[in-house]
Every structure is written in structure tokens, then in C-alpha cells.
Amino acid sequence: MTAVRAPRRRASSDEQGGFDFSRPDEIVCGVDEAGRGPLAGPVVAAAVILDPAQPIDGLDDSKALSAKKRDALYELIVARSLSYCVASASVDEIDTLNILHATMLAMKRAVEGLSVLPTLAQIDGNRCPTLTVRAEAIVSGDALVPSISAASILAKVTRDRMLVDLHERFPVYGFNVHAGYGTAKHLAALREHGPCEAHRRSFAPVRAALDLIR
């Protein structure tokens, strides 16, 4: 499993103590995922520590933003965050562990890949992965906490790009349009062509398509 991260550098103790996230004694990373629901492709997670000296306007839940806005914010987050890491869990890991545990694994990888050690990880949703740092779950955190919003954008944009790449390999499914979600056209393609190696065989519609071609 590979992770995409900011160039590694360790913040000095003075720099780490200078954050102001309304939690002056904390170094907070926001964590979110993309791709729990689709029938194909990996689940992707991102962890982001924002730099208060370089604020980013317009951060929000990635699902509330247009693709153009997400792409623009992605570049700003990569350029301005103090540290970020994007990681994933593969289709094989999803099928072996189940989607919940694979998502927790991707989140853990993202946090552990940060070049600056956080003291607190704020996780979107109602569950936290097992981490070596303190963690708290925040329901709707991707719309409420800027660093989680940033993580949601990195995860979403990264995964969408992965699915565009998968479309080049498996064009009959339309991954570039629906990102692996179970749209009517995707389900029709599954029934006609059967699943490819990128499909999650632990998901019921994929299993049903397999049964049709046996």
C-alpha cells in the first residue's frame, strides 16, 4: 500500500507549540475517507494538519463542492497544509476485512503517514480507528471542522482520479462517470460483462453479477 504525503519535515517544538486551532495545546489533524459505498475501487483516507499561518478559504464537505472547486482546493491544501497524507485500502483488503475495517485501516495509514506528529486526530463520523494518538469522532465533521473538510477533499479528489485511471483499463463500466457507485448504468454493465478485478466481491450487487455468469 502506498501513501501520498507532503515532503517530510519535522516541526520544531517552538513551531508545534505555536498552533492556534482554538486548542492551543494541541496539534490537530483532520481525517476523512472517500469510497465506502462504491462497488469498485479502493477506499481512500486522508489526514491533514492545517497551517494557521496560511488559511484556506472555502473549505467544506467535499460532497457539497463542485468538482472544479474541489480540484482548486486540493491544490491549495497540498501547497499550504503543514502536513498531509493520503492512503488507501485495496479491493482485496476490503473483501478480506469488510468495508468498515478497511476504512479504519486506510485512516490509520493516513495518520501514521503524517510528517508532523499530531496530538489529536479528529475523525469524521462516529467511529475512530485504533491510533497511537488520541482520537475523537465528530459526526458531520467534514462540514464543521476545517481540517476534516480538507481531508475529505484530498480523499475525494484522489479517489476520483484513481477511478478515472481504472476507466482507462476497464472502459465498459464507466468508472470515470460514477466513480464505482452502483448507478443504473454501472449495474447494467455488471450484468452484461460481469465484474472486473477492481470490483468488490464482498458487495451484494457484485456477487449477484458473478452468479449470473457462472
From Swiss-Prot:
GO terms for cellular component: cytoplasm; ribonuclease H2 complex. SUPFAM superfamilies: Ribonuclease H-like. CDD domains: RNase_HII_bacteria_HII_like. It catalyses: Endonucleolytic cleavage to 5'-phosphomonoester. It is found in: Cytoplasm. A divalent metal cation binds at D32, E33, D124. Keywords: Cytoplasm, Endonuclease, Hydrolase, Manganese, Metal-binding, Nuclease. It holds the Pfam family RNase_HII. Manganese or magnesium. Binds 1 divalent metal ion per monomer in the absence of substrate. May bind a second metal ion after substrate binding. GO terms for biological process: DNA replication, removal of RNA primer; mismatch repair. Its cofactor is Mn(2+); Mg(2+). The keyword Cytoplasm applies. It comes from the Bacteria. The keyword Manganese applies. GO terms for molecular function: manganese ion binding; RNA binding; RNA-DNA hybrid ribonuclease activity. Residues 26-214 form the RNase H type-2 domain. Endonuclease that specifically degrades the RNA of RNA-DNA hybrids. Belongs to the RNase HII family. This is Ribonuclease HII. The gene is rnhB.
